[in-house]
């Protein structure tokens, strides 16, 4: 009715004002450096939360996609196919708007919407990396473990796991570094990350924030590259 419509409109306006003030608080900081740093913190938070949730979720999807129960197997693979076959930008819009449009359950926090979209997207990619690593181990090693009287769990953790980790580190590190750059896509749902902050100052005639933004990403990705290189070096003793 009219009252309900008015209340919904009023609630939407209040949220819009609150969101705008939150964005302005970040982008109108005391200095461009502070604004860019605040924006990059959002990128970093999105990055770490995505990794924390997507890595284990990807493993669950992997086990489902390799299950002998065919409905679960094909459901998992269809999910991965859809997620990998559609743009992450589109998935951000879907997560933010579809729950409210179809189920009257809008996601009030844009950061939460971004986290959900990124976790779903990267879990699908990680699951394929895991699956490729597991399937690359020869069947004979499973059979050898069975001959020795080991259970399936013992075979996986004592024989297979280290080989899988060794093989998936390069593609996994590539996806992780890609994730750092993909966090900038959150700006399409008005999340004030670093590129949105830099763009605001660029429109005011400052060009250096763009180079500062590149420096932020280069330094962070450089640290990740060194970290994964160290991990690979530590595992060089284990030849596969």
Predicted regions and their residues:
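Extreme N-terminal basic, low-complexity initiation segments
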Residues: 2-11
